[in-house]
Amino acid sequence: MEQQSHKVLVVDDDVRLRQLLERYLRDQGFGARAVDGAEAMDRAMAREHYDLLVLDLMMPGEDGLAICRRLRGTKSDVPIIMLTAKGDDVDRIVGLELGADDYLPKPFNPRELVARINAVMRRRAA
């Protein structure tokens, strides 16, 4: 599988979705970890390198757009896929303008998330 070496960090405040995504991504061959917000993400990223973030837009505290803005402001080039219930055009456009690499509205098919992760990683490798 092409994704076996990719380490993915999922950042979402929904515990059931975090568990589902972590398990599904691992089953698909990714090195996956899931955390509940910005502080846990910062701790995880300080300890380990991640190849891609799956980032929820609406979270308590620092939301996904603020996290994306902060990461891009520090020149972090880690690919970001926004995964969120906010699916209207304005939210998608703002997320992409702030530096997200892709955007997937909830509800979603986990296979589509895997396909999008692989597509982002292929583009980064090119």
Task: Go through the PLM ranges and name each one.
Residues R18, P60, T74, D88, ...:
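The feature encodes the CheY-like receiver
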